[in-house]
Amino acid sequence: MIVVVIIGILSTLAAYGVRKYIANTKTTEARNALGRMASAVVIAFEHENMASPVLGQGTSTALTRALCKSATKSVPNAPTAIAGRKYQSSLADWNTDAATNSGFACLQFTIDQPQYYMYSYAANGASQPGDSFTATANGDLNGDQALSTFQITGAINSSYVINVAPNLLEVSPEE
């Protein structure tokens, strides 16, 4: 009888451990994607743009660096698309803002595999010290309408360099 009880306890613990392991592997998608997105923000910011397309001989113009403007839509655009399931995005989802060279199109960021998370990008300002960005991944792995949130932020410092947060903010990561 004691053996049956011990086996029952061990199987319960094993089921819990496997569930935690599976949830952790799914959250890896959000962590990796946000890291890639933060790198894309830095690369886009460091890409210098001239204010004038053609310069006359003997003249100069200022080079500008700017954060990509905010994305107008998340991918996917509603949390119901990722509630307890995966979403297969299309290139059109990521290029919604291509006409204005903003959002994910400006970052040249896409995910071509099925995804558990809804991604968004927001910029606060463009090129001055203190201007910042936030990249967010929201998920609903168990389909209970309660979203998990992963965020990474960065800001332009006084030397006009982007400082990216060393850690992700994670709220209810296994939700």
Which residues fall in each region the model found?
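N-terminal single-pass transmembrane signal-anchor helix
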Residues: 1-22
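Amphipathic alpha-helical segments that mediate coupling or scaffolding at interfaces
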Residues: 21-24, 44
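Membrane-proximal amphipathic alpha-helices
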Residues: 23-34
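Short, glycine/small-hydrophobic-rich surface segments
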Residues: 41-109
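Acidic, glycine-anchored loop motifs typical of Ca2+
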Residues: 50, 140-147
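Intrinsically disordered, low-complexity regions enriched in Pro/Ser/Thr/Gly and acidic residues
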Residues: 98-126
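Low-complexity, S/T/G/P-rich flexible repeat/linker segments used as non-globular hinges
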Residues: 147-175
